[in-house]
From Swiss-Prot:
Name of the gene this protein is made from: GAM1
Residues annotated as the enzyme's active site: D470, E473, D638
GO molecular function annotations of the record: carbohydrate binding; glucan 1,4-alpha-glucosidase activity
The protein's role, per its UniProt record: This glucoamylase has a specificity toward both alpha-1,4 and alpha-1,6 linkages.
InterPro entries xref list: Gal_mutarotase_sf_dom (IPR011013), Glyco_hydro_31_AS (IPR030458), Glyco_hydro_31_C (IPR048395), Glyco_hydro_31_CS (IPR030459), Glyco_hydro_31_TIM (IPR000322), Glyco_hydro_b (IPR013780), Glycoside_hydrolase_SF (IPR017853)
Gene3D superfamilies, alphabetized: Glycosidases (3.20.20.80), glycosyl hydrolase (family 31) (2.60.40.1760), Golgi alpha-mannosidase II (2.60.40.1180)
An annotated GO BP: polysaccharide catabolic process
Record-given protein name: Glucoamylase 1
Lineage: Eukaryota, Fungi, Dikarya, Ascomycota, Saccharomycotina
The species this protein was found in: Schwanniomyces occidentalis (Yeast)
Length: 958
């Protein structure tokens, strides 16, 4: 949750010291304690310990040295050809020691790993004090085939170099275009600063380099800071995740390639008019080039190497409801009942930190969430085929040793006994404020059993269905080990008011003219409390505040090169653990800060496998890194209830698709601030087409469940009916993404990669290859503009609602009717979409009859597929894949696999049939149909498919 979200804990290195409102926790192995709503006097974390040291980012510092101008570079000597490439030694020409101490000698290794992949690896000859990212933490792409033999003529990529004033180029062999070139730019490689520059073509199109709130294209002038950061979704700032990969889409040659730097270092990337500059503050150079040649090819090649996305359970495609403020079991129950009352499908209800006792992980509040009522609620939820997901913040509370009941908090003792918590350089426990529940030191030391145990014990108490992993950048609300020697004052308040009332509203919201203003006002919950005036003093420590050069690892708290970190002072320790915090094997946070969330996700995923053997773990996490998609889905973080953030959710989804995190969604209707009926209506409909669909908001904001406003409820029911009808299509896309790495939401420029006019389109998107969504992203309008590539030429589009072909023109920005409650949706000709009659839950929907929507292209052809299994098994023993093809007025269905879907096929709708057929046959039997405006509606097929819609091959002819 937001960095405003509270100092939920005085933290222990890898654990959280949940601190806030109340007394001892009801935790695993502890007895119930006083209510967390207690009004007794409490200590407060002093504000001064939250303030970092003011840094001037180098990019804003006019007096900063330009490394590219000052550095002398290296010469390449001792080049040796290898079966897969070459090796050599880079010798420093002259030390300049601009932002660290230059390394005299570097090892160069070039490896042709596959026909479409090339690796360039540069590291110091002496690796003392150099962090090299271990392969067991983040997988390293390996050579395909025989490592001792390769036919270089087969490679799509060619490596060329110059010995004197070393530089290199990567060239596409088929077109001879230079994809990457450091010519004219010296390599800088020191203990705390690495820099290389590559030329780019003019009018380049660079995408990726997440995570930030930005449009699809990183235009010239963009600065991308890659440093995981707990901050509430600032536009153009570094936020939760780090993904050092970009796509370079070139329209002159109609090709796309990808470049990936495998590093966990703090990084900064500058996009110029004709160049890209990449910097890191530690580590080595480990570059991978993927040749594409299409955007989809390049994405798949990259994602395949970092790890294909997790296969999410079928139920995850249902609607999820959450908010910070469901603070009693009665409120949770009321929300679930209201969704049923208003006939709005609800699959999963979520809990934010409200359920915890004093905000301690793995606990429940015995007064607001009494265990018997809590379990009864969960039993009823599961009985109705619904699900529950609680939050798990990345921290373990440090109990007060002077309080016997408080000291019974077992998760702390588990971790302490196995020595998994972060340490200060002197070996003492690093104690911050709001830290991680998944113990990072444990990950590096391979100790997982305690994590498995606490999660399993937690599940035994309150049987959840998945985990929401938050605050795992990792976040700490104070600078340094501020809790050292102070945990005996726990629990303690944060240094700000928790849940203060939100006063902002979306652009276009007029209070005086808002017919629902009165009801909105009445729904505001006065939950803010005033914190105590007492304080917890910070621990004293000696810190080098200067960005000075230092030998060895260097000055890691304040490195000589200051990045632009989106915190008020740019201090690396602001809202984060200090860079000098030490992990189990001596690794410092400075080198692996960006990995924290990823390693938590890995451990949590495997702990969930202990809870749900051979079931697909469900997890949504905030901080991500390459390969995180193998373990988790992702949500867009603490956005704002405003139109701009509805728009930004689309390019953010594209960026996560590139990064291998296709199961993505934003907080629908907005997290921070107050939403209104118009924005929420539009956003609920937009969100219904994202893979992950959740409404969530801030404690102090007004209610924004879709049933709060009648207009939003109706709009939601309309779009949810479409989503649930298309669940088989979405599940098939989930499977495709899991097996191929393809994103689910797709940019127009990926679908039509040779049309430069589409390069920046990020206000529309494809769902798979078959659906085009054109949302309204501004207030006070009833029309929206959209483009439809190839329309009127080689492409055909059909209106979802009328099922008629729309006569658009290629390259024209078409005006679409979009009254409130209506989201324009079109089907691209040439696709077959599997459907299933929607029910209230995913489980109900899966029991209903199937259908097919066939959208013919200009040649009367179409194709598609359907994937089915039990929807939850990690290792799928039984599955069904149905291939659909249409040509010559015949639809053919060819199933393969042994999974039995008992539900019949009820109907088939065929779009784009020019003349009314004389008859329609299922196999050789005449079947009922109607014809209207180029659409054939075939019904009554259930009597021919009683044994299951896809139990055998069939044809339908017309």
């Amino acid at each position: 949750m937001i960095f405003l979200k509270l100092i939920k804990s005085i933290v222990i290195g890898l654990g959280l010291v949940s601190a806030i409102q109340a007394a001892p926790a009801s935790s695993i192995g502890s007895s119930a304690s006083a209510s967390s709503s207690s009004e007794s006097s409490q200590a407060t974390i002093p504000n001064d310990v939250t303030l970092g040291v003011k840094q001037i980012p180098n990019i804003f510092n006019d007096s900063a040295v330009d490394a590219n101008a000052a550095a002398k570079g290296y010469d390449l000597v001792n080049v040796t050809n290898t079966p897969r490439g070459l090796t050599g030694i880079l010798k420093l020409k002259e030390a300049t020691n601009i932002y660290g101490y230059d390394f005299d000698y570097l090892n160069l290794t070039v490896e042709y790993q596959a026909d479409t992949r090339l690796n360039v690896h540069i590291e110091p000859t002496d690796l003392s004090d150099v962090f090299v990212l271990p392969e067991h933490l983040v997988v390293k792409p390996l050579v395909e085939g025989d490592a001792q033999s390769y036919n270089f003529d087969n490679s799509d990529l060619v490596f060329e170099y110059s010995n004197t004033d070393f530089s290199f180029e990567v060239i596409r062999s088929s077109t001879k275009e230079v994809l990457f070139s450091t010519k004219g730019n010296p390599l800088v490689f020191s203990n705390q600063f690495i820099q290389f520059n590559s030329s780019l073509p003019k009018n380049h199109v660079i995408t990726g380099l997440g995570e930030s709130i930005h449009g699809l294209v990183n235009e010239p002038g963009s600065v991308k800071t890659l440093f995981a950061n707990d901050v509430g979704d600032p536009i153009d700032g570094n936020i939760y995740g780090v993904h050092p990969v970009y796509l370079d889409q070139r329209y002159d040659t109609e090709t796309t390639h990808a470049v990936y730097w495998r590093t966990s270092a703090i990084q900064e990337v500058l996009i110029g008019e004709e160049s890209i500059t990449w910097r890191a503050l530690s580590g080595v150079i480990d570059l991978y080039f993927f040749s594409g040649p299409t955007p989809k090819d390049a994405i798949q090649q990259y994602v395949k190497e970092i790890g294909l996305p997790a296969f999410q359970p079928y139920w995850s495609l249902g609607y999820h409801q959450c908010r910070w403020g469901y603070d009693t079991i009665e409120k949770l129950s009321e929300v679930v009942e209201n969704f049923k009352k208003f006939n709005i499908p609800l699959e999963t209800i979520w809990s934010d930190i409200d359920y915890m006792d004093s905000y301690k992980d793995f606990t429940y509040d015995p007064h607001r969430f009494p265990l018997d009522e809590y379990r009864k609620f969960l039993d009823e939820l599961h009985k109705n085929n619904q699900h529950y997901v609680p939050i798990l913040d990345a921290a373990i509370y440090v109990p007060n040793p002077n309080n016997a009941t408080d000291n019974e908090y077992q998760p702390f003792h588990y971790g302490n006994e196995t020595d998994v918590f972060l340490k200060n350089p002197d070996g003492s426990l690093y104690i911050g404020a709001v830290w991680q529940v998944t113990l990072f030191s444990r990950f590096l030391s391979r100790k997982h059993s305690d994590m498995d145990k606490v999660i399993k014990d937690w599940y035994e108490l309150t049987p959840f269905d998945g985990i929401w992993a938050d605050m795992n950048e990792v976040s700490s609300f104070c600078v340094g080990s501020c809790g050292t020697g102070k945990y005996f004052e726990n629990p303690a308040y944060p240094p700000f008011t928790v849940g203060s009332k939100a006063t902002s509203y979306p652009v276009g919201f007029d209070v005086s003219n808002a017919s629902e203003w009165k009801s909105i006002q009445s729904s505001i919950s006065a939950t803010a409390k005033t914190s105590s005036t007492s304080s917890v003093s910070s621990s004293s420590s000696t810190i080098d505040y200067m960005n000075t050069l230092a030998p060895g690892k260097g000055n890691i708290n304040y490195p000589p090169y200051a990045i632009y970190n989106m915190q008020g002072d740019s201090d690396l320790a602001t809202h984060a653990v200090s860079p000098n915090a030490t992990h189990a094997d001596g690794t410092v946070e400075y080198d692996i800060h960006n990995l924290y969330g990823y390693l938590q996700e890995n451990a949590t995923y495997h702990a969930l496998l202990e809870v749900f053997p051979n079931k697909r773990p469900f997890m949504i996490s905030r901080s991500t890194f390459p390969r995180a998609g193998k373990w988790t889905g992702h949500w867009g973080g603490d956005n704002t209830a405003d139109w701009a953030y509805a728009y930004f959710s689309i390019p953010q989804a594209f960026s996560m698709g590139i990064a291998g995190l296709p199961f993505f969604g934003a907080d629908v209707c907005g997290f921070n601030g107050n939403s209104d009926s118009e924005l929420c209506s539009r956003w609920m409909q937009l969100g219904s087409f994202f893979p992950f669909y959740r409404n969530h908001n801030y404690l102090g904001a007004i209610d924004q469940e879709p049933y709060v406003w009648e207009s939003v409820a109706e709009a939601t029911r309309t779009s949810m009916a479409i989503r649930y009808l298309l669940l088989p299509y979405y599940y098939t896309l989930l499977h495709e993404s899991h097996t191929t790495g393809l994103p689910i939401l797709r940019a127009f420029s990926w679908q039509f990669p040779n049309d430069r006019s589409l390069s920046g389109v990020d206000n529309q998107f494809f769902v798979g290859d078959g659906l085009v969504v054109t949302p309204v992203l501004e207030p006070g309008v009833d029309k929206v503009k959209g483009v439809f590539p190839g329309a009127g030429k080689e492409e055909v589009y059909y209106d979802w609602y009328t099922q008629r072909e729309v006569h658009f023109k290629d390259g024209k920005n078409e005006t679409l009717d979009a009254p409130l409650g209506h989201i324009p949706l079109h089907i691209r000709g040439g696709n077959v979409l599997p459907t299933q009659e929607p029910g209230y839950t995913v489980a109900e929907s899966r029991q209903n009859p199937f259908g097919l929507i066939v959208a013919l292209d200009n040649d009367g052809k179409a194709q598609g597929s359907l994937y089915l299994d039990d929807g939850e098994s990690l290792v799928v023993d039984s599955s069904l894949l149905v291939s659909f093809s249409v040509s010559d007025n015949t639809l053919s269905a060819s199933p393969s696999g042994d999974y039995k879907a008992d539900q019949p096929l009820a109907n088939v709708t065929i779009l784009g049939v020019g003349h009314k057929p004389k008859s329609v046959k299922f196999e050789n039997a005449n079947v009922d149909f109607t014809y209207k405006k180029s659409t054939v509606f075939v019904t009554g097929l259930d009597k021919y498919t009683k044994d299951g819609a896809f139990s055998k091959d069939f044809t339908i002819t017309w």
